Amino acid sequence: MDFSKAFQYKKWANNELLDIGEQQFSILPERDATFFVRILNHTTVVDSLFISRIMGEPEKYSGDNTVETPTISELRETMNQNDSWLVQYVGAATKEDLKRVVSFKFIDGDTGQMSIEEILLHLLTHGSNHRGMASRVLAENNLERPKDTFTRYLHQLEPSRRVGG
């Protein structure tokens, strides 16, 4: 499986959501604004945990979210670092790399094993799920939300796909 476009899309979708969310952040009720940041921060922490596991390095977090809620700019910085790492990694990964099995401990202490390919698929689906939750907060407040679809990303990236459809 070629993950390159999927992780480029993930990075694009994260930036789209943060851009639109940040523009309207002051309009959100405090509880919803906090949820918006914390649910996206959760995905960023989980990305970081699995990146550490892929690299065989110590994990930077002891939970699946941080105690303190980051600012949107702090969240954006960490999210972009993770997304950039993932885009670079999948661009260079071989089929053998993707089949490699990683053993690790989940945050709750249970042990687990996943192939790199399974980890990457988890990060894609997990991130999409929680972007949807954050986007729902915008919708519930009658605010603009991104059109977070892979098809939109592909057609924006390659406008020639619209010709002759």
Give residue spans per PLM region:
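Helix-adjacent hinge/juxtasegments
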Residues: 59-100
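Short, contiguous alpha-helical
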Residues: 4-65, 107-165
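Short amphipathic alpha-helical surface micro-motifs
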Residues: 33, 81-85, 103, 133-134
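Exposed alpha-helical structural elements
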Residues: 2, 49-50, 74, 85, ...
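Glycine- and aromatic-rich loop/turn segments at beta-sheet edges
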Residues: 26, 98-103
